[in-house]
Amino acid sequence: MVEYTNTFKVAAVQAQPVWFDAAKTVDKTVSIIAEAARNGCELVAFPEVFIPGYPYHIWVDSPLAGMAKFAVRYHENSLTMDSPHVQRLLDAARDHNIAVVVGISERDGGSLYMTQLVIDADGQLVARRRKLKPTHVERSVYGEGNGSDISVYDMPFARLGALNCWEHFQTLTKYAMYSMHEQVHVASWPGMSLYQPEVPAFGVDAQLTATRMYALEGQTFVVCTTQVVTPEAHEFFCDNDEQRKLIGRGGGFARIIGPDGRDLATPLAEDEEGILYADIDLSAITLAKQAADPVGHYSRPDVLSLNFNQRHTTPVNTAISTIHATHTLVPQSGALDGVRELNGADEQRALPSTHSDETDRATASI
């Protein structure tokens, strides 16, 4: 049963990473986690791929030039799920008794993913969800998620969900999230300063509109967290004035938004680092849903509905003959999650996965 009576405090981070340095950015992340906990928060949220930072170089140079300069370093500083860096994040959540949603560049074998880690206050990994479809030139760096990455998680304080960046432009993805009665949503973004003012769709106003609309459409609280572009970013990514103009400056728009669309905390300047704090009262959701509940009384499923495949999929299913096999297949460290081992014609056993059984559901119709 979904409850709407809890009250608690949340934190939204607006900050830049230590560019493409996983260890130092984890240090900064742990420090921010501690600060949010000292201020009485039950949840702190971090930007998209905060560790080790958003790859702005893909937007300001040719793919070949960007790869030559940054690809190896970015790959090396992306996090594997069994890395000491991830363990430090889990430990920080446990030590400070606070839930954490943090964006990382996840390395799985040779591929990278735009991942959000959902960690509870006991330091347990609740979810590792990947961006379903990286945006535009992001697809030259990152792979895709799957249906199991669209989910909402029961936390002690609320039903919690998270999406990255332009996933907030994906109408069907949003509707699937709303259908799971999400109460608090983490919207993780990079700093949106690219190509301004020539391309308004990439600017702060457009992204903030999408973020605020998420709160209004879903009648949910939104904790919006962003990176910022500072002179340090220019120094790191840019070789000339033209590239500095393309990346721009600032781009921060962290917010904490209520289900009626109002800001619950005073925003920072677009180029300022800091943490926003706000108190959440879930009963405000019930007031908003009295007017419009798009997955309840304000829906018409007989006219419009969504097919939602939440199954976790993998590119390889391995069959092993029990008659002719001379050794047992053992999944190697870092192997694909959910690769299946088939012993005989009728037996199928899933290898260990970070996903729960719940995320392996068959296609659902909403």
UniProtKB/Swiss-Prot annotation:
Superkingdom in the source lineage: Bacteria
Ranges of biased composition (kind: Basic and acidic residues): 355-366
Domain CN hydrolase: 8-282
Record's protein name: Aliphatic nitrilase
Gene that this sequence comes from: nitA
Coiled-coil stretches noted in the UniProt entry, renumbered to this chain: none
GO molecular-function terms, A-Z: aliphatic nitrilase activity
Sequence segments annotated as region (Disordered): 346-366
Native species: Rhodococcus rhodochrous
Similarity section: Belongs to the carbon-nitrogen hydrolase superfamily. Nitrilase family.
Enzyme Commission code: 3.5.5.7
PROSITE patterns: CN_HYDROLASE, NITRIL_CHT_1, NITRIL_CHT_2
Keywords: Hydrolase
Active site: E48, K131, C165
InterPro entries from the UniProt entry: C-N_Hydrolase, C-N_Hydrolase_sf, Nitrilase/CN_hydratase_CS, Nitrilases_CHs
